[in-house]
Amino acid sequence: MATPDAGLPGAEGVEPAPWAQLEAPARLLLQALQAGPEGARRGLGVLRALGSRGWEPFDWGRLLEALCREEPVVQGPDGRLELKPLLLRLPRICQRNLMSLLMAVRPSLPESGLLSVLQIAQQDLAPDPDAWLRALGELLRRDLGVGTSMEGASPLSERCQRQLQSLCRGLGLGGRRLKSPQAPDPEEEENRDSQQPGKRRKDSEEEAASPEGKRVPKRLRCWEEEEDHEKERPEHKSLESLADGGSASPIKDQPVMAVKTGEDGSNLDDAKGLAESLELPKAIQDQLPRLQQLLKTLEEGLEGLEDAPPVELQLLHECSPSQMDLLCAQLQLPQLSDLGLLRLCTWLLALSPDLSLSNATVLTRSLFLGRILSLTSSASRLLTTALTSFCAKYTYPVCSALLDPVLQAPGTGPAQTELLCCLVKMESLEPDAQVLMLGQILELPWKEETFLVLQSLLERQVEMTPEKFSVLMEKLCKKGLAATTSMAYAKLMLTVMTKYQANITETQRLGLAMALEPNTTFLRKSLKAALKHLGP
């Protein structure tokens, strides 16, 4: 599908994406890199899809140049103008996935452009530098042979190395004897190369009969059997060979696109993910122009739109989650206006049978996540209606795709918090959906915005088990010293002590008393009074 250079009209109250002025292929790629932990893999899928659709070879030189180009942006509360390159204006998750993708396709990148990008990345003066980005940048610089020689040194922080070693020791109980990465020993490599074909099997037998005498857990044994089965398969095909019709791909000779395997048979990249087909089903490929026309109709607000969902939308049931990702990117769903979003959601909610949970999660992320994170003022009524309607039917997908990312995003502010509070206060929210939301919030690190959303949810008198209530009380009491001046925390405490008075045990009451002791908000007297009502 040839994506037009100009995107669909932006959503109401949403700032344009930093890459909005780039050419269509670059926009599609950067948009795919926004997809959380799977962003790098989705980026590879977009590259392959662009090739199989007959586009020109992806111009990495032009994209790297655009990433380094400085543009004036408004910074700080005083609204001062500063020159800032596009790379540093990208969201943090997009920067991470971009660096991962650059590592994967490094052999096909112009070295001068890559060096410029790495230099820009080093100039990031953020108060909380990202250790993951630093490590990826260091690895890329090593590959290019620039900077101080650090052969044998790890780009990971000492804390990360300790955690990795601990993880390897834990996994080693399964008999795999995992070790943290170390510089290869030339003598060991030479000895390994000279081993006879039967050596590996013998070693495996000796390992199985090791004096440790520990039985391999069933789950780990299943993983091992699966890995052995994978090793017996032919070498993974390149991305080009997976394309329908065998059409030539402009990116066919990129070494990165083939799955690299080490001598131990383990993949350097996620072989399973790369081998997974990212081609759209033939039926959907044929209907792409019609789907684009439907979205255009939604945007233009034409009268007489059919109430029943168009038959073309039934084809969504034929997509796997990865194919749904690709379809959302090609249709530029994140750039729908709020009116178009509401109308599309109306159609999606009327589909029969319902969407699968995994596909509904992908759609939630594509339609809502970027839109919510970009809000600078209160969400429009159209956006709020679309989100609450979608959540009423697909609660689990909305929770998994939105709650965690929005509450943990560094840029979450009043606009995002207000929308989440509206979401958890929905009258149509079933009790089990309330418990689901509560469980997800309890697993997150808490901050000011979390207090507000949690207080709105608990106002609904959520029915929870004693175990879950105990977790809530424990986290609540632990936050007392760190939230002595927080009005949001004080309101949350007041809600818990009044709405859930019958659930609070004597031990929990003592914990609340200690947590409230240093509180300095003007609700202090009300909190003390509520605490007295819990008295023995």
From Swiss-Prot:
Its annotated compartments are: Nucleus
What GO terms fall under cellular component here? centrosome; chromatin; chromosome; cytosol; Fanconi anaemia nuclear complex; nucleoplasm; nucleus
Q: Which domain of life is it from?
A: Eukaryota
Region (Disordered) location? 171-252
Location (main, coarse)? nucleus
What are the entry keywords?
Answer: Disease variant, DNA damage, DNA repair, Fanconi anemia, Nucleus, Phosphoprotein, Ubl conjugation
Q: Which residues carry this modification: Phosphothreonine?
A: T346
Q: Could you tell me which residues carry Phosphoserine?
A: S249, S374
Q: What biological processes does GO assign it?
A: gene expression; homeostasis of number of cells; interstrand cross-link repair; ovarian follicle development
Q: Which Gene3D superfamilies match?
A: 1.25.40.480
Q: Which Pfam families match?
A: FA_FANCE
Q: Where is the composition biased (Basic and acidic residues)?
A: 230-239
The record's region (Interaction with FANCC) falls at: 150-371
Q: How is it modified after translation?
A: Phosphorylated. Phosphorylation by CHEK1 at Thr-346 and Ser-374 regulates its function in DNA cross-links repair.
Q: Its quaternary structure?
A: Belongs to the multisubunit FA complex composed of FANCA, FANCB, FANCC, FANCE, FANCF, FANCG, FANCL/PHF9 and FANCM. The complex is not found in FA patients. Interacts with FANCC and FANCD2.
Disease tied to this entry:
Fanconi anemia complementation group E: A disorder affecting all bone marrow elements and resulting in anemia, leukopenia and thrombopenia. It is associated with cardiac, renal and limb malformations, dermal pigmentary changes, and a predisposition to the development of malignancies. At the cellular level it is associated with hypersensitivity to DNA-damaging agents, chromosomal instability (increased chromosome breakage) and defective DNA repair.
Q: What does this protein do?
A: As part of the Fanconi anemia (FA) complex functions in DNA cross-links repair. Required for the nuclear accumulation of FANCC and provides a critical bridge between the FA complex and FANCD2.
Descriptive protein name: Fanconi anemia group E protein
Q: Which organism is it from?
A: Homo sapiens (Human)
